Amino acid sequence: MLFLLSIACGPSVDAPSSSAIKVGDDGAEIDTSAAGISAFVASKAYKTWAAEANVHTATKTRPHGHVRVFFNQTSTVALKQNQSSLPVGTMVVKELYQNDGATLSGYAAMVKSSEKGWTWWEAFLPNLDKPAAYGIDLPGCKGCHSGPGNVDQVLSQVP
């Protein structure tokens, strides 16, 4: 399954240079380099964000299997206001689970890093410092996230 996820999102393409973007509900910044996103996810700082109530099966068109999605305040406000273009600083973190829906296997994150696009990141335990996918507007990530029902690449409903 991990191989399929790597193929779905694709390898690193057009990796962005390190830059800091405000994503924290308290104005905290995140370094959008692969190492910066890895460190942010490993810190579990996203756990204070709005989140789906439970782990659930992703739809058949999504490669992530079982997921639980967390939304930063920027994304929560924009999605609740039905904005069609989300602001820079929007961040969504997905916890990825094995088929049993209980065993955490990795994470995927997306950060609106510019008005024109998203920085995508995906890594699997125990190697969060070695992402399977990382870059700006990765074709595999964009391919799925551009599907029906998306709001500026976000497919999940804010809780």
Question: What are these language model-derived features?
Answer:
Residues M1-L2:
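Sec-dependent signal peptide recognition
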Residues F70-N72, L79:
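Small cysteine-rich, disulfide-bonded extracellular modules of the LU/uPAR three-finger superfamily
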